[in-house]
Amino acid sequence: MSFTDQTYTRSCMHTCITRDHRLYGIVIISLLLLLDNSVFCQNENKVIDIKKDEKIWPYRICSGMSQATDIVRFGRNIQCPEYSPKDEGTEGILLIYKQNIVPYIFPVRIYYKELTIRYRYADVFSYYDMGDVTKKIPIMETEKTLIDMDGKCYSAARYVEGGAYMDAYDGDEHNHTVPFMLGYQNPDGGVTRYVTVDTHRPCLPGTWLRKTCTTVNCIVTDTYAKSRYPYDFFAISTGEIVDGSPFYTGDNDKKFSETYTKFKVYNEYERLEELTVSSTKKRTFDKIAFLEKRDYSISWEVKEEDQAPCQYVLWKASTQALMTKTVNNTYHFTSRELTATFGANDKEELKLAEKYPCVYEDAKETFEKMFSQNLKDTHVLNNDAKNNYSYVSHGGLILIFKPVKNKEIVQLMNITHLLNNTHANMTKHRRKRETSSSASSKGIYDLYGDLNVAQVQFAFNTLKSYINQALMSIADAWCRDQKRTNEIWGIISKINPSAALSAIFDKPVSARYLGDVISVSKCINVNQDSVRIYQTLKVPKTGEEWGDRMQCYSRPLVTFRLDNETASTIRTGQLGVDNEILLGNYRTELCQENSIRYFVAGAQIHVFQDYDFYHTIKLSDVDIVDTFVHLNISFLQNIDFQMLRLYTQEEQYASRLLDLETLLRDFNTYRQRIYKLEQAIVTKPYVPPAGMQQALQGLSGVGSVITGTLGAMQSLVSGVASFLQNPFGGTLSIILIGCIIVGVIIIYNRMNQSRGSPIDYYFPYVNQTLPQRQLQQHVGDPPSYDESIGSSHTYSKEDALLMLKAMKELDKSEKEAQIEATKSQPSIIDRIRRRGYTTLSSMNI
C-alpha cells in the first residue's frame, strides 16, 4: 500500500484527532523542553523530525543491491608455527624481497618501407577502385646508414617475390633521396613515427582506361621494447616480437634465435636523435645492434645485463621482527608491523653475493639506513651471530634477516663478562700464595664479587629465559587467536553477513553469500535531513476486517529522499537496525496488547506504546552491556590488519610486454584508411528445394545428372550476373547490345527494300544511263525490221543463261570499278593532313 493513499491518510488523521488535545499539547511541550526533539503532525501524516548524530552510522540503504562490487572469503586451514621452549628466538631487522615483474624497458628504432600499389579504372561518370596491395619491406643495412646519418631515405624499394627481385618507385618516378617529416607522436605511449610521404600519390586514370599507381613510404618509428627475465626475447610496443636477447652481442652466450646473417653489431655508432629536417643533434652509442627481419628492420643499444632491473625488489621492511627456529628445523619470521609470519627451510640458505648481487648490495644499504634511523639509540648489532640470514620463503620471497640486541641486555652481559674475568684473574694470583695465607687473605670483596657474579648470571639467565618464553608464547597465542577469530567470524557471517562484514570493515556494508564467497556492496547514504519517522505503527484498514487483532508494523515507517533528488520527492520505507532504511512496508505483525517498543534512530530512542508514539529518550541514557574484559596496561598499541598487496597496479601495468592500449592507439592513429581486401571466390553447389531434392534423389543417377545440370546453369547465370555487375563488363555489354540493335535495324530496312524493289536492290546499276561511248558504236544504218524485233517473242534457256552470265560479268565489273574508285580516294589520315586543299581536275594534253 502506498503511503499517500487516502485510507492511510484518514487513519493518520484519526490518530491525531482522537487524542486529548490538552494532554497531547502537554506531552509535546514536555518533550520539547526536556528532550529537545521536535514531534509534530505535518499536514495529514504524523512524522518525527530526527536529529542525526555524526558519530554514528548515517541513514543508508543497504538492502536490495542487485549486484555487488566486491567478493571476499574467509581463510581456511591457517597453519601456525609450532613453537616450543627449545625454539631459538632472535630479534632483528627483516627485509622481504619479491620477484620484480617490471620488465627491462629500452628504446628501439624500427625501419621499413610501406609499398602501396593501387588499381583504378574510370568511365565517363566516375572512378572505380579495383583494389590495392600493401607490402612492408625491410630497409637494408646500407640504406639504414643514410637514414641515421643524414635523415634521408631512397624513394625506391626492392623486394623479392617469386624468386626474383622486384623494384618499385614512388610515384612511378626515378629513384632519389627524400627527407623525413614527423608523421605521428604519442609521448604517453613513447611512439614517434617519421615518414617521407604523408598521403598516397594521386591516381586518376583517363576515361575508359585502367591505371596502376605506386606509393613508397619510408617509415621510421622510435619506440620502446620490453623484455622479462631471463631475457630470451623482447616485445615492441607496436606488436612485433624479436626472438632473441636484447643483450646479445654476437659473441656471448645469450639466446638468439633470429637469422645470424641478418644481424650485426656496430661499435661507437653515431646517429641523429630526431629525423626531422631541422634536427642536427646526434648521439653516439657504445654498441648498437641491427637486425633485418622479413618485413621490417630494427636497431637497439646493446648494454650489459647487470644494467637491467634487479630480479627481486624490496617489498616490505620491518625493524621489529622475530626469527624463530622450530623443532622441525624451519625458520619462521614474524613481523609486528606486517602482522604476518613467513616460513622457510633452514637448509636453503642463499648466497646472495654470488647469485643475486643486486639484492645483496641493496639489502646491505637498506640495513645500514634502517639501523641508523630507527635502532641506533636502543640496539646494537649482534656480532655473535651471523652477519645476516637469507632464505627463500615458501611463497618464493627472499627473506633477509639481520640480528640485533638491546643495549641494556648487552650492558648486562658485559658486566657479567667483566666480573667473570676479574674472578678468574684473582683466582690465578691466589694460587701463587701460600696455603696458610689463603684463607686469611680472602677478603669481603672476593666473596662479594663471587656473589655478584652468581646473582648477575642468575638474573640474566632468568631474564633471558623469561623473555624468550614470553616472546614465543605471545607469537604462538597471537597466531592461534587470529585463527580462531577468523573461524568465529566465518560462522557469524553465515547468520548475518551484513552485520559481520560491517563490524570487520568498521563501516556499514551490505553482504550476502553467493555460494562459498561473500558479495560485499557499499551502502547508499540518503539525505540525512530528509528522514522522517511516522508516529504510529498501526496498519490502516482497507475495508476488510482483520479479525480479532489488527495488523501492525514491526518497524517504524519512514520517508526519505536521496541527495540528488528534489525536496518534493518522497520515498518510503521502514527503519532498520543501526539507522538502516529497509525498503518496502511489508514487515508487519499481529498487534499485541500493552506492547512497548524501543527503536533507535540517530542519537535518540523513540518509544512506541500500544503501537503509537509515546516519547523519546536519549541514546546515551541507556546503559551498554559491557562485554569487554579490560586489561589494565598502559602503552598498549593497537595493530591494524591490512591486506598485503604483493604487486601494485603500477607494477602489474608495467609488467605487460605488449600493451594493448598503446597498440590500439597506434593502430587507430596511423592506419586510418581501410584497405580493400580481395574476396576469395567460393563456388557454391546448387541446392534445389527440399521437395524437389527428395524427388531427384529418388531418380538415383538421373537425378544426380539433373542436379549437376541445374548447378552448372546456376553457375553460368551467376557468372553472367557477376560479369554484368563489373563496371567493365556492364559497359561492354551495353555496347554489344547497342551494336546488335543497330544491326537488326539495318537488316530490317534492307529486307523491306528487297521486298519492295528487288531489281533495284539486287541490281542497282540497272537504272544507270549508258555511257556516251556505248551509243557511238551504234551510229550508222539502222537494222532491218526483222533484225530489230527478232524472230520470236520468247527467249530460250540458252538466252536466259547468256543473260545471267552477262549480268554476272556486269556485276563483277561494277564491283571492281567501285573498289578502284574507293582506292583512288584519300584515306582519313590524308584528309586530315591535306585539309584545306582541293583536288585539281586532271586534263589530257
Curated annotation (Swiss-Prot):
One of its GO terms (biological process) is symbiont entry into host cell. Residues 42-727 are virion surface. Residues 120-126, 204-212 are annotated as: Involved in fusion and/or binding to host membrane. It is found in: Virion membrane; Host cell membrane; Host endosome membrane; Host Golgi apparatus membrane. Residues 677-725 are annotated as: Hydrophobic membrane proximal region. Residues 1-41 form the signal peptide. The chain crosses the membrane at residues 728-748. Disulfide bonds join 62-523, 80-479, 153-218, 310-358, 552-591. Gene3D superfamilies: 1.20.5.1890, 2.30.29.100, 2.30.30.1230, 6.10.250.3280. InterPro entries: Glycoprot_B_PH1, Glycoprot_B_PH2, Glycoprot_B_PH2_sf, Glycoprotein_B_ecto_C, Herpes_Glycoprot_B. Keywords: Disulfide bond, Glycoprotein, Host cell membrane, Host endosome, Host Golgi apparatus, Host membrane, Host-virus interaction, Membrane, Signal, Transmembrane, Transmembrane helix, Viral attachment to host cell, Viral envelope protein, Virion, Virus entry into host cell. Residues 749-845 are intravirion. Its main location: virion. Glycans are attached at residues 175, 328, 388, 414, 420, 425, 564, 632. One of its GO terms (cellular component) is membrane. The keyword Glycoprotein applies. Belongs to the herpesviridae glycoprotein B family. HAMAP family: HSV_GB. This is Envelope glycoprotein B.
